[in-house]
Amino acid sequence: MARFEDPTRRPYKLPDLCTELNTSLQDIEITCVYCKTVLELTEVFEFAFKDLFVVYRDSIPHAACHKCIDFYSRIRELRHYSDSVYGDTLEKLTNTGLYNLLIRCLRCQKPLNPAEKLRHLNEKRRFHNIAGHYRGQCHSCCNRARQERLQRRRETQV
């Protein structure tokens, strides 16, 4: 992987990094900043889709794999949880409309789309302040959590 010595010239988004390296998302080989494994193709696309930032260690760009994103999101939640608020309260606290706020998923870090934010409002679900940023749950993580709860119930029933 190429080195980017000058911090002012470093691309911080994966598509920009691909442009700088004259490659494509399909062909880039980038390692996870946490576990040091090379990201699989699906993980590269997920990282780009989630609009996450590329980080640099010793001037070398790194991303994060799916497992590490899930794991460190949970760690961040446990260590830095502050409070939870409803959507209308969040709008009043920030003086910004809910649809203009960048709210990421609690688990996978994907930015919530307007439909997912509306789901939080309609179902009276709270947004959680974790390390100074509000988080919710995207549709797929919400369904995954529901499936995990159902599985645990089935396992505990006699």
UniProtKB/Swiss-Prot annotation:
Instruction: Supply one GO molecular-function term.
Output: PDZ domain binding
- Motif PDZ-binding domain: list the residue ranges: 156-158
For this UniProt record, give its keywords in alphabetical order, as a comma-separated list. Answer: Activator, DNA-binding, Early protein, Host cytoplasm, Host nucleus, Host-virus interaction, Inhibition of host innate immune response by virus, Inhibition of host IRF3 by virus, Inhibition of host RLR pathway by virus, Metal-binding, Modulation of host cell apoptosis by virus, Oncogene, Transcription, Transcription regulation, Viral immunoevasion, Zinc, Zinc-finger
**Single Gene Ontology BP annotation:** symbiont-mediated perturbation of host apoptosis
Recorded hits in InterPro entries, A to Z, give: E6 (IPR001334), E6_sf (IPR038575)
Domain of life of the native organism: Viruses
Chief subcellular location: host cell
In which compartments does the protein localize? Answer: Host cytoplasm; Host nucleus
Q: Where are the zinc fingers (unnamed)?
A: 32-68, 105-141
The GO cellular component terms are: host cell cytoplasm; host cell nucleus
A Pfam family assignment:
E6
Q: What else is known?
A: Belongs to the high risk human alphapapillomavirus family. The cancer-causing human papillomavirus E6 protein has a unique carboxy terminal PDZ domain containing substrate.
Q: How does it assemble?
A: Forms homodimers. Interacts with ubiquitin-protein ligase UBE3A/E6-AP and thus forms a complex with human TP53. Interacts with human NFX1 and MAGI3. Interacts with human IRF3; this interaction inhibits the establishment of antiviral state. Interacts with human TYK2; this interaction inhibits JAK-STAT activation by interferon alpha. Interacts with host DLG1; this interaction leads to the proteasomal degradation of DLG1.
Biological role: Plays a major role in the induction and maintenance of cellular transformation. Acts mainly as an oncoprotein by stimulating the destruction of many host cell key regulatory proteins. E6 associates with host UBE3A/E6-AP ubiquitin-protein ligase, and inactivates tumor suppressors TP53 and TP73 by targeting them to the 26S proteasome for degradation. In turn, DNA damage and chromosomal instabilities increase and lead to cell proliferation and cancer development.
Recorded family membership: Belongs to the papillomaviridae E6 protein family.
Protein name per the record: Protein E6
Q: What is the organism field in this record?
A: Human papillomavirus type 18
